[in-house]
Amino acid sequence: MSRFTFKQFHINQNSCAMKVGTDGILLGAWADVKHCKNILDMGCGTGLLALMLAQRTEENCQIQAVELDPIAAKQAQENINNSVWKNRIQLTQVDIQHFLQTTEQTFDLIVANPPYFEQGIACKNEERELARYTKQSHLNWLEWAATRLSENGRISFVLPYEAGKTLTKSTALFCIKQTNVITKIGKTPQRMLLTFAKQPEVLMQDQLVIYDADNQYTEAFIELTKDFYLKF
C-alpha cells in the first residue's frame, strides 16, 4: 500500500523501506503526552509517530523528527508538509547519535520504534536493511535518548517481547510502564510497549490483546486507536 489514510492525516510511503505498521500505530497512540512541550521522534521513517503525536498534543508542543535515510526523510517531510501540523514538526536528516550529541535541546518525551533485528539474513535492499537491522543495540538507543531527556521526561519504545525483556534488565533507567502486546487472545506476547524515566516510580504493567477469539478487534484496541483508524 503506497498511501495510508488516517482520520486526520495521510501517509505516503511508496519511497520508504519500512511501511506503516501496527507497532508504530500502537506506540503513537499509547505514549503518554501529558504536559509535553518538546518531543523527539528517533528514526521517524514515514513521519507516522511525529504526526500521531502532533494530533494528540496541544498547539504549543513542538516535535523534532530525526531520520538517517535521505529517501525516507524526504517522504516524511512531504507527509509533514501535507498535514495541518507542519509548523509544529521539524525534521532533520542526520544520524540520531550525531543529533543527540550536538543538540542542546532537552525533551519531555522521546519515542522510538527502533530497528529490531540486530543480526540475521541480509534484506533484499539497502534501505530496508538500514531500517530493520542495527549494529547498535536497543540499549545504545535508550542511553543516547537519556542524554537529552528532561529531568521528569519519559522515553517510550516499542520492541519485540524478548528484546523488551532484555532491555529492562540492562538499563540504569527506571521502567515505569510496560504493556505486553498479544496479537490474539490465548497467544503469548509478541511485542512490548515500554516507558522509562530517570526517577523511580511504581511500575504499571498490563497487557493489550489486538484480536479476540473470533478474529475481531478487541474493545481495548479499538479504544486505544479509534482517533486514528478510519475503520473505527
Swiss-Prot record:
<dbReference type="GO" id="GO:0005737">
    <property type="term" value="C:cytoplasm"/>
</dbReference>
<keyword id="KW-0949">S-adenosyl-L-methionine</keyword>
<dbReference type="InterPro" id="IPR029063">
    <property type="entry name" value="SAM-dependent_MTases_sf"/>
</dbReference>
<keyword id="KW-0819">tRNA processing</keyword>
<dbReference type="InterPro" id="IPR002052">
    <property type="entry name" value="DNA_methylase_N6_adenine_CS"/>
</dbReference>
<keyword id="KW-0963">Cytoplasm</keyword>
<keyword id="KW-0489">Methyltransferase</keyword>
<dbReference type="GO" id="GO:0003676">
    <property type="term" value="F:nucleic acid binding"/>
</dbReference>
<protein>
    <recommendedName>
        <fullName>tRNA1(Val) (adenine(37)-N6)-methyltransferase</fullName>
        <ecNumber>2.1.1.223</ecNumber>
    </recommendedName>
</protein>
<dbReference type="Pfam" id="PF05175">
    <property type="entry name" value="MTS"/>
</dbReference>
<keyword id="KW-0808">Transferase</keyword>
<comment type="similarity">
    <text>Belongs to the methyltransferase superfamily. tRNA (adenine-N(6)-)-methyltransferase family.</text>
</comment>
<dbReference type="GO" id="GO:0032259">
    <property type="term" value="P:methylation"/>
</dbReference>
<dbReference type="InterPro" id="IPR022882">
    <property type="entry name" value="tRNA_adenine-N6_MeTrfase"/>
</dbReference>
<dbReference type="InterPro" id="IPR007848">
    <property type="entry name" value="Small_mtfrase_dom"/>
</dbReference>
<comment type="function">
    <text>Specifically methylates the adenine in position 37 of tRNA(1)(Val) (anticodon cmo5UAC).</text>
</comment>
<dbReference type="GO" id="GO:0008033">
    <property type="term" value="P:tRNA processing"/>
</dbReference>
<dbReference type="InterPro" id="IPR050210">
    <property type="entry name" value="tRNA_Adenine-N(6)_MTase"/>
</dbReference>
<dbReference type="GO" id="GO:0016430">
    <property type="term" value="F:tRNA (adenine-N6)-methyltransferase activity"/>
</dbReference>
